[in-house]
């Protein structure tokens, strides 16, 4: 199993990354919580990974910290939660907020996440409550996202595309991004603010 990669960040187009490790390009999928803390393209980064082997593909999921990967692994063990939904949950809510929702039995907040209905929210609460007690405090490694001066039109399009990939409807994603003042924001910041408005 591939548990960790260290390499040069070649591409980042949420939710996909391309990481060059000693001349081999690894295609990775990552939650937006990881995108928020990635360095600029061309910089070296260490990512913790989870490999999923299917009949038709081998998929690598990347996380900024071991704790985040641990939460993802706990999520995909919940009945009805696959890797895509697990990434959506980590992208749509901070680990601390998710923990609070589970501990307090807050199905309303959980159902606001893309792909999470009432039954899935109830299952998450029941199955994750004990697992979260066994996990160390959640957190993300202390890396910072890159900043750009002025938001390019491609940045807005990338943000909308990332929200659609997370399960939001295209018109809903566009509407949420249009409501923001996107000037001088990175793609990750646009996505984060749009998600906060939609939740």
From Swiss-Prot:
Q: Outline the segment boundaries, as ranges, of region: Domain III.
A: 151-199
Q: Which GO molecular function annotations are given, in alphabetical order?
A: ATP binding; four-way junction DNA binding; four-way junction helicase activity
Tell me the keywords, alphabetical order: Cytoplasm, DNA damage, DNA recombination, DNA repair, DNA-binding
Renumbered residue ranges of the record's region Domain I = 1-64
**A single Pfam family, by name?**
RuvA_N
Question: Which portions of the sequence form the region Flexible linker?
Answer: 144-150
Where is the protein found, in the record's own terms?
Cytoplasm
The record's annotation in CDD domains points to: UBA_RuvA_C
InterPro entries hit by this protein: DNA_helicase_Holl-junc_RuvA_I, Hlx-hairpin-Hlx_DNA-bd_motif, NA-bd_OB-fold, RuvA, RuvA_2-like, RuvA_C, RuvA_C_sf
Keyword DNA damage in record: yes
Q: Where is this region: Domain II?
A: 65-143
What does the record list as GO biological process? DNA recombination; DNA repair
Gene3D superfamilies according to UniProt: 5' to 3' exonuclease, C-terminal subdomain, DNA helicase RuvA subunit, C-terminal domain, Nucleic acid-binding proteins
Question: Which GO cellular component terms are attached?
Answer: cytoplasm; Holliday junction helicase complex; Holliday junction resolvase complex
Report the principal subcellular site.
cytoplasm
The lineage's top-level taxon is Bacteria
**What does this gene product do?**
The RuvA-RuvB-RuvC complex processes Holliday junction (HJ) DNA during genetic recombination and DNA repair, while the RuvA-RuvB complex plays an important role in the rescue of blocked DNA replication forks via replication fork reversal (RFR). RuvA specifically binds to HJ cruciform DNA, conferring on it an open structure. The RuvB hexamer acts as an ATP-dependent pump, pulling dsDNA into and through the RuvAB complex. HJ branch migration allows RuvC to scan DNA until it finds its consensus sequence, where it cleaves and resolves the cruciform DNA.
Q: Name the family the entry cites.
A: Belongs to the RuvA family.
Question: Which NCBIfam families is this protein grouped with?
Answer: ruvA (TIGR00084)
Quaternary context: Homotetramer. Forms an RuvA(8)-RuvB(12)-Holliday junction (HJ) complex. HJ DNA is sandwiched between 2 RuvA tetramers; dsDNA enters through RuvA and exits via RuvB. An RuvB hexamer assembles on each DNA strand where it exits the tetramer. Each RuvB hexamer is contacted by two RuvA subunits (via domain III) on 2 adjacent RuvB subunits; this complex drives branch migration. In the full resolvosome a probable DNA-RuvA(4)-RuvB(12)-RuvC(2) complex forms which resolves the HJ.
Q: Domain notes, please?
A: Has three domains with a flexible linker between the domains II and III and assumes an 'L' shape. Domain III is highly mobile and contacts RuvB.
- What protein name does the entry list? Holliday junction branch migration complex subunit RuvA
